[in-house]
Amino acid sequence: MSFIAIIPARFASSRLPGKPLADINGKPMVVRVMERAQASGADRVIVATDHQGVVEAVERAGGEVYLTRPDHQSGTERLQEVIDRYDFPDDRIIVNVQGDEPLIPPQIILQVADNLAGAEAGMATLAVPITTAEEAFNPNAVKVVVDARGYALYFSRATIPWDREGFARSREHLSHSLLRHIGIYAYRADFIRRYVSWSASPLEKIEILEQLRVLWYGEKIHVAVSSVAPGMGVDTPEELAQVRLLQQQLD
């Protein structure tokens, strides 16, 4: 499988300022993510950042990095600048690896690239089963509903599908399967170029979910169930502390 992994690494973060450079047992977070992506078998791994400090950290670690404009509204827009700068061909598979996933299993990165290659869709992603009621009703856990062939019908922060009879009896136990979306994407370069030309959709503004723009404009997203459990992401100081402990066990 031939693909390029790009890691958008925006320096500003409302809940964890300077997140890409946060130290995780002797290495910046962005370097931890880069090393995971390099282990996936990607032909090339590029960090895309708006901050010179991140550029220097990646270069010190021997990685490839590109300094983007600071005014991008999303990670996908940052990707688009990179693919245009390097003039990647339209059919090149690009995997968007989130810059705050220092424990992401390399297998997931390869799997989402494989998923796109075998699907009739402009975009591919992954999901995992939801096993607890707490997660099912957590708006920070994005749910996805798919059709019989695995193509996304809708993504939502709400609990979908809603089990009318089951939840009427109890909301403590799940009587049907739900899927939680994992924020990793694969697309071909031409799809990214088209995506950034579309205006933001009403649904994505309501849910604050960028992927809803794809469905709004009639495109398909294929969703596969992840082959392994995803690693823990980092959005808060508390999560950073947890990831440091987990990484210590791996080092």
UniProtKB/Swiss-Prot annotation:
Enzyme Commission numbers on file: 2.7.7.38
Source taxon at top rank: Bacteria
Chief location of this protein within or outside the cell: cytoplasm
Listed InterPro entries: Cytidylyl_trans, KdsB, Nucleotide-diphossugar_trans
Catalytic activity: 3-deoxy-alpha-D-manno-oct-2-ulosonate + CTP = CMP-3-deoxy-beta-D-manno-octulosonate + diphosphate
Broad class of enzyme this protein falls into: transferase
GO molecular function: 3-deoxy-manno-octulosonate cytidylyltransferase activity
One of the record's GO cellular component terms: cytosol
Pathway: Nucleotide-sugar biosynthesis; CMP-3-deoxy-D-manno-octulosonate biosynthesis; CMP-3-deoxy-D-manno-octulosonate from 3-deoxy-D-manno-octulosonate and CTP: step 1/1; Bacterial outer membrane biogenesis; lipopolysaccharide biosynthesis
GO biological process: CMP-keto-3-deoxy-D-manno-octulosonic acid biosynthetic process; lipopolysaccharide biosynthetic process
Keyword line: Cytoplasm, Lipopolysaccharide biosynthesis, Nucleotidyltransferase, Transferase
Subcellular location(s) of the protein: Cytoplasm
Similarity-based family: Belongs to the KdsB family.
HAMAP family: KdsB (MF_00057)
Function recorded in the entry: Activates KDO (a required 8-carbon sugar) for incorporation into bacterial lipopolysaccharide in Gram-negative bacteria.
NCBIfam families, per database record: kdsB, PRK05450.1-3, PRK05450.1-5, PRK13368.1
Protein name, as recorded: 3-deoxy-manno-octulosonate cytidylyltransferase
Source organism (scientific name): Sodalis glossinidius (strain morsitans)
Gene encoding the protein: kdsB
